[in-house]
Amino acid sequence: MQYLQFLSLVVLLLMCHARKSVYRRNSPSLRRLTRNYDWEVDEHGGLKPIINPAKVERATKNCANDSFILGTIMSNYNRHKIPGGQVDVEVEVWVQEITTISDITSDFQLDIYIYETWYDPALNYAFMNPCKYNLSLNSVLLEKLWTPNSCFINSKTADIHKSPFPNIFLMIYANGTVWTNYRLKLQGPCIMDLTKFPFDNVTCSLTFESFNYNTDEVKMDWSVNGVQKMRDKMELADYELVDIHKIRTTEEYPAGYWHELTMSFEFKRRAGWYILQAYLPTYLTICISWISFALGSKAIPARTMLGVNSLLAMTFQFGNIIRNLPRVSYVKAIDVWMLSCMTFVFCSLLELAWVGYLSREEEPTSAKCLQPSAQVAPKPCHPPPVQQNANNSSVHRRQKQPKNEEESALLSLRDNDYGYIPPGFGLNGNVANAMKSFSSSCSCEPTNVVNLMLDEAETIPTSTSSSLSRKQRREILAHKIDSVSVFMFPFLFVLFNIAYWQHYLRGY
């Protein structure tokens, strides 16, 4: 019997020790919650809680409600006093949406949730036996509490969403921890280097810091989560979000050192629109300009129309693209492409001008011959005898000395060794009179004299055959230029494409 009593005492001692161990392992808040429960030994020898309705009802009646807690802690609260002399603030950002990125103004817009957490011992209400161990409050009470007065120092605009009320969340835990949440619409700057546009990357950043307190009073740092996206994949029409970086730096100001929390967004431009609207049309325009090489040297008007229209179309395309870009002073990748393609079209026009110059028809110099009259019968003409000079083997005609200027002109016409008759010869009526006066020495009519001189001119060889061969050579040269251009222009354009795409797609 005594042995059984001894065993019962040992079991009771073990149960008491186990219950104390459970209380010791749990936090004070958990021990307060267990006041509403009874305990029993389970099949493994441990303790499990059993709800006691009487204890719950008694604890509910005696707990402090929200109004009592707020009235108590705010009665002696000083919002200008820094909690504990120095505060550690943890910041966490959740990106809800990135709406736009502007190339003209070099900025971006986004919606975020930003959380701030710090400890304020003056707001501790755990000792009041609260009914709730966290109080969810609105922005009205936040204006009465101490805050780190943090802001985005490099934002262009920052607005709190107010639909249907200010989107500010405040929670105060029983141990004095303050948790705030703001839903903001921000517009921040972007660093744009358009040298490789449209195959470039854009970096946008926002910097968050306490505006009033330096590191001696407020220390700011990222939380474990840092910056997170609310959606796995965020894409815009022109950009794709590549990565988000969080950075913590210490910056020196005249008033001391400040902690700055920077979140950097890296975007990659989507080049599909520019390929469809700029690159592919220019390929077609360049190919159209090459069609003129196959039309031949006789289709100068058609070739001119093709070249000019190609150049105008490319200029119009270039203007539509650059009007949506900032006016930068350096050369962009799209500038290199468009200007190079315009140069190819312009060179095809220069080739056309060269071919047109070579293939143009030169008008032969026509001589107006004096025709004999049909009513007057020609009389035989006996020209003066011709004497050969052995010294120079030239022909000298014996002739009467001219009496006046008209006869001198007529003699010059007769002695013309090249068979050339001036275009205006015979228009003056005095020449006919000179022929009549000159006919007495030749015993023939004036018309017969002219015919005689024309017959003599036909016996002299001309350059007709040489002029014809020169025209043929020019046409052959024009054809060769077109034949070479058909292969040279595409070959040079392919070389340009290889160099262009290899350079600008590197690192994209």
Swiss-Prot record:
Top-rank taxon: Eukaryota
GO cellular component, one term: presynaptic membrane
GO molecular function: extracellular ligand-gated monoatomic ion channel activity; transmembrane signaling receptor activity
Subcellular location, principal: membrane
Key words, A-Z: Cell membrane, Cell projection, Cytoplasmic vesicle, Disulfide bond, Glycoprotein, Ion channel, Ion transport, Ligand-gated ion channel, Membrane, Signal, Synapse, Transmembrane, Transmembrane helix, Transport
Gene deletion effect: Viable, with normal growth, reproduction and locomotion. Increased sensitivity to the acetylcholine esterase inhibitor aldicarb, but normal sensitivity to levamisole, an agonist for postsynaptic acetylcholine receptors on muscles. In response to induced acetylcholine release, the amplitude and rise phase of excitatory postsynaptic currents (eEPSCs) during synaptic transmission is as wild-type, but there is prolonged and slow decay of eEPSCs during the late phase of synaptic transmission, which results in increased release of synaptic vesicles in cholinergic motor neurons.
Extracellular compartment residues: 19-274, 322-335, 502-508
Cytoplasmic side: 296-301, 357-480
Range of residues in the leader sequence: 1-18
Disulfide bonds: 190-204
Parts of the chain that traverse the membrane: 275-295, 302-321, 336-356, 481-501
Segments for region (Disordered): 374-407
GO biological process assignments: chloride transmembrane transport
Effect seen on changing residue 314 to I: In ju825; gain of function mutation. Irregular 'curly' body posture and slow locomotion. Slow locomotion defect suppressed in an acc-4 null background
SUPFAM superfamilies: Neurotransmitter-gated ion-channel transmembrane pore, Nicotinic receptor ligand binding domain-like
Annotated localization: Presynaptic cell membrane; Cell projection, Axon; Cytoplasmic vesicle, Secretory vesicle, Synaptic vesicle
Glycosylation sites: 65, 134, 175, 201
Similarity remark: Belongs to the ligand-gated ion channel (TC 1.A.9) family.
Physiological role: Probable component of a ligand-gated anion channel. Negatively regulates synaptic transmission and synaptic vesicle release in response to acetylcholine in cholinergic motor neurons. Role in synaptic vesicle release kinetics may be in association with the ligand-gated ion channel protein acc-4.
Protein name: Probable ligand-gated ion channel 46
Record lineage: Eukaryota, Metazoa, Ecdysozoa, Nematoda, Chromadorea
